[in-house]
Amino acid sequence: VAARSLSNAVLVLTGASSGIGAAVAEAAGAAGMRAVLNGRRAEKLQAVAERVRAAGGEALAVPGDVTREADVEELFAAAAEAFGGVDAVLANAGYGLEKRFDATSMREHRAIFETNHFGTLLTLRAGLAAVRAEPGGLRHLLVTSSCVSELGPPRFGAYAATKAAQDAVAQALRAEVAAEGIRVTTIHPVGTRTEFFDTAAANSGTDRSLADTNTPDLFTQTAGHVARRVIAALKRPVAEVWPSRPARFAFAAATAFPGLTAWGLARAAARMEKQGR
């Protein structure tokens, strides 16, 4: 299948001020795309926009919060006003939480779902309407999920639950809009060298992430590597992007052998408890 041209295509990205979102924005600029960037940190968002322009693309920064429907509507309205329409959407906004289940409050559970899952739903709803209005465009919706959408690692149960929820919605949506020629892709990064683990530790009230220190190099990657895989998926759409092939096989095996997985996760939990004391 021939690769689709991304030149002048309009990509709306949430969570674009850092990490994977910022890396995808820059890669999109290098591919000649026009990137509409959303995030809560306006100064960082503007800095990313400058890097997109330096890479060869166009950029528009639209600060906002994906948990607020009015902000999401404003984001897509700004994209349409600036560039005439939207070709593709990457719902990337989200954060991590690294806490035992019995130490996680219901407020924390609801808050992470509000951003990671319901923020994604708001983005996808607006994004679906936008790409439907462009019959000649890329018509592509993408979601930054995670490898842990496949299982619940110790101390990451709340976070993993949001990613599993994203996956379920994306899978259903993929089937529902396939006949319209609209593509839906989920991205499943492993431990990515971004602010993620630092933020997860901060949200958990600790000064370091036990998950980060226990993640083998084989299951870590750079945001730039993930971004290159996202751009490749925009050119040649696929249902899922797993930037780490070893992780894909490992998580498939984990699903196939639940008893072995339970044993391995229990060992990991015991090791983290020992290190956390």
Regions inferred by a protein language model and the residue ranges of each:
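The beta1-alpha1 cofactor-binding region of Rossmann-like NAD(H)/NADP(H)-dependent oxidoreductases
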Residues: 63-74, 106
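Active-site helix of classical SDR
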Residues: 124, 162-165
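SDR active-site lid
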Residues: 179-245
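Substrate-binding pocket helix/loop in short-chain dehydrogenase/reductase
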Residues: 100-101, 105-110
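A short, exposed helix-loop element centered on a Lys and neighboring polar residues
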Residues: 124-125, 171
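Conserved glycine-rich cofactor-binding loop
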Residues: 17-18
